[in-house]
Amino acid sequence: MTADHRAGRLERVRAALAERDTDALLLGPSADYRWLLGYEPPGLERLTMLVVSAAGDDHLVVPALEAPLAIEHLGDLGVKVLAWQETEDPIALVVGALAAAGSASQSRLAVGDHLFATFLLRLQAAMPSARYTTSSVVTGPLRRIKDQAEIDALARAGAAIDAVVDRLGEWVVPGRAERDVAADLDVAIRAAGHEQTNFTIVGSGPNGASPHHIAGHRVIQPGDAVVIDIGGRVDGYCSDTTRTLVVGEPPEGFAELYEVLRTAQAAGCDAVRPGVTAASVDAACRDIITEAGYGEYFIHRTGHGIGLEEHEDPYIVAGNDEPLSPGMAFSVEPGIYLPGRHGARIEDIVVCTEDGGRRLNTTSRELRVVG
């Protein structure tokens, strides 16, 4: 991210603060922090806090041992680094930074959604008259719309995870434990260009009916349906895709169930276009599954936003009447889960464009037989 890019984001945050009559944004290490500064220090017991003021006087309070890293990354961005020693109270530096920026004790402050509770409680004790809200009311609307560089990063992440999906038949074979398949997937995800693996869900047979199953000791058997949900991070941006395979002959009725799911997922992707609500995309998938008699077995929302985080705004769920806009990126991932038997899910990342929806995953969604 260029210095101009970061400076532009800081200006947009300041404008959002002013619009919401909020004096400052306070962020610890988080996706919001990374979105603004282009790097993220470790979120440890030592306080790191970025103070972005609506007045334009920004500070970064950091432990002294991490100050060189902060200075290197900030460059000439104009953020003042306040390094604190082990014997100092960093909250006092935060309060001082707010005062220097003109924020009084009764300020309205937007605090990072993922800030450690211990830091927030200490800040509230130091500024009991301040009014507090969450950072997402400020940063959420800004991060929700991806710029072209972000979309390009998501596309690279999608291509990298697709390269792993193309090889699933190498690992999903009878006689292998789920956890061993997950370990191979972790290696393959990194080898495909991800700097880290975010998750490797391998749910075989009845375990596939648990959407967030943790890969365990169960051995994959002939006739199993196997749900594979994998993702990582490329250039800071996340990939996330799900495919369902069958080992040999599909279980009774599974091919018909899967075809319902495939039709529903395609309908959800086709429904994406500017002005359509998130709830409408959910309904496009859910109505087909419900009409086929599987409605009670579709037990989660249709999708979630994606970017610097695996799950972020917008959420594709009933009741979310927010209209889609070009630049929004999210998953479309309906699933059908029959407890004690098997599950199935298909997931693609979709970007809303001026003309409709662009899928960032291109691997086949046909029922794939392996083993």
Language-model segments: what does each one mean?
Residues 1-371:
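Active-site neighborhoods and metal-handling regions in enzymes and metal-associated proteins
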